[in-house]
Structures are given as structure tokens and as C-alpha cells.
Amino acid sequence: MSQDLFNVPIFFILFRETTEAAIIISVLLSFLKRMFNTESPVYKRLRNQVWIGGAAGLFICLCIGAAFIAVYYTVLNDLWGNSEDIWEGVFSLVAVIMITAMGLAMLKTERMQEKWKVKLAKAMQKSNSEKSSFKEKLQKYAFFVLPFITVLREGLEAVVFIGGVSLGIQGKSIPIAAIMGIICGCLVGFLIYRGGSLIQLRWFFVFSTVVLYLVAAGLMAKGVGYLEQNAWNQVIGGEAADVISYRVSTAVWHVSWGDPEANNDTSGGWQIFNAILGWNNTATYGSIISYCLYWLFVCCYLVFSYFKEKRAAIRKAEAGEWDDGDEALENAKQYIGNDGEFIVEDKESDEEANNHPKEKIESDAIKA
């Protein structure tokens, strides 16, 4: 029953994406506190822009996600008909891909704060170097546009992940998991804004990744099991329950207890094991081999990613790129004016000054 009301992957996906959105907001607010007096009208105006921009991006994402889920469960849910096992298997394998990608992102969450400091600093520098009439109009609302675009992008990414994971699950298992994920992500963002650090939550994110991979491995086994079940139904020419529920020649075990699909008082614990660990009272060679191969793939990929990131860090250090987020934001201060607007370099003036260096020197001397 519990797996029908709370979907674990949905919770962790929204928790991770909400955490990233909250970090974006907290980094911008911290930057404004460094730049301006917190009692000044400029600070209050820009702070409101940050909150409104982030809220607008989040609202649009929630609307898109709700529309997707509503369309799926009201229009598309009954399309597969007699091919339900095939669709269940395909949806499970799609969810495996989505959850695996989210697990990899979860492992990098502790570095998310530094990443967004550097990203936002680069965005400010880019706005400073590019001049256009459209950009000039947006200067007054730059601190609305930055959180709006970044939160919208992260939110749409969450919609894509949830779309892949939610296929084949019951709609009533989404709301509670989604709400709890958003609340927990906002709480983490608030703690970071108040002076915390994601590094202190490292082991929590590692634990979350392990849970996600356990779920994904279980879904891999269940997906293969659904496809095998469909093949068995084709052999016997009907529903397996009418003859025998499994192919004996490919079964590794089949026990009468521990059935997660049984509707009785003792099935609650087995339903939890089924949702998190992929437990089933019937196992086949295909489901067990796919389960083991999934873990082998994950372990090999994590080792590969570790050495890849290590080499990338060495290249960044040799190139002298920003590595410290606070240093990047400190450098970005020069691109913000006293009124909170982005300073746009006038390239034409610079070119004219380069063509007439003597006049520029005399002009600077007069100003001095």
C-alpha cells in the first residue's frame, strides 16, 4: 500500500532539483548582500526581483509538470490494452535510465554551490561584454531574468525526469512524494543561505544516491520480468493466471509467500521491498542477470567518472580557470553598477579610444 501513496524516485528527483533551484536563489541573495547595504532601496528592489524571478520559473514548471501528468493519466493511460506487460517493461527500463542519470547528478550535489557561483559570475561577465538594445532594456531586471531562466531550466529538467519515471506508476503515488521533495529541497536551500554548506550533507547525498540505484536496479529486474512475462503469455495463449503464472524452465525461484501484488494484511512489507529493492516472489535468469549487470555498469561508470573529473580538474588548474566560487563572485562585482544594473561595455568607445590614444590620455588627464 505504501508504494501506491509514495514514490521514492519522484521524491529524490524533486528534492535534488529543488535543492539546485534553492541554491541559485541563495547564491544571488548572498551576492546582493555583499554588494549593497541591506537597508538600501536598491538591495530591496533587487532582492524582490530574485524572489519573483525564481517563483515565476518554478510556477511555470509546476504547470507544465501538472499538465503532463494530467494528460497522461486521463488520455494515454489505457492505450496499451492487451500489451500491458510490454508497456510496463518498457516504462520500467526508461525509468532506469532516468533514475541512473539523476543518481549521478545527486553525487555531484555537494559541489553544486560552487558550480552556480562560478556560472552566475560568468553570466554577469557575458552580459557585460555583449551589448544590444534588448539587453539594455533587460538591465533593470537582470536579477529577475537570471533566477527565472535558471530555475525554469532546472524545473523543465525535473519534468523530463519525472515524465520518464512516472510512466507505469499509479498517479496517487506522485503528489505526496512531490510535495515532500519540494519542501525538503527548500529547507536545504534555506540552511545553505543561513551559512551552511553542502559538504556537510555529503553523506546524505551519497545515501540518497544508493537508494536511487537500489530502486533503479530493482526496476531493471522488474522491466525484464515484465517482458519475459509477456513472452510467456504469448506461449500459453492467454493470461498466465489462467494456466501457470511463470515459465518453470527459466525460473530461479518461485515462492508462495512474499508476493508484493497480493492484497492482504501481510503484503505491506513486501510492497516496500518491491518498490525499493525490486523484490518479487518469482525470479528468472533474465531478471537476476540484468540486476547484476546493472550494478556492474554503475560501478564501472563511477570509476570512469572519477578519473575523468580528476583529469578535468588538472586541466582547469593549468588553464587558470575559476575554481573558487567566492573568488568568482568577488570578480563579478565590477560588472554591477551602484543602481544594481549590469554595466555594459561600450565597444565603439573602446575602438575610438584605441584609434586616438593621444586624445584619450589628454581626456583622462583633464578628468583627473
From Swiss-Prot:
Biological process (GO), any one: reductive iron assimilation
A Pfam family: FTR1
InterPro entries in UniProt: FTR1/Fip1/EfeU (IPR004923)
Domain of life: Eukaryota
One Gene Ontology molecular-function label: high-affinity ferrous iron transmembrane transporter activity
Statement on biotechnological application from the UniProt entry: Passive immunization with anti-ftr1 immune sera protects DKA mice from infection. Thus, ftr1 is a virulence factor and anti-ftr1 passive immunotherapy deserves further evaluation as a strategy to improve outcomes of deadly mucormycosis.
Family statement: Belongs to the oxidase-dependent Fe transporter (OFeT) (TC 9.A.10.1) family.
Name under which the protein is recorded: High affinity iron permease 1
Organism encoding this protein: Rhizopus delemar (strain RA 99-880 / ATCC MYA-4621 / FGSC 9543 / NRRL 43880)
Upper classification of the organism: Eukaryota, Fungi, Fungi incertae sedis, Mucoromycota, Mucoromycotina
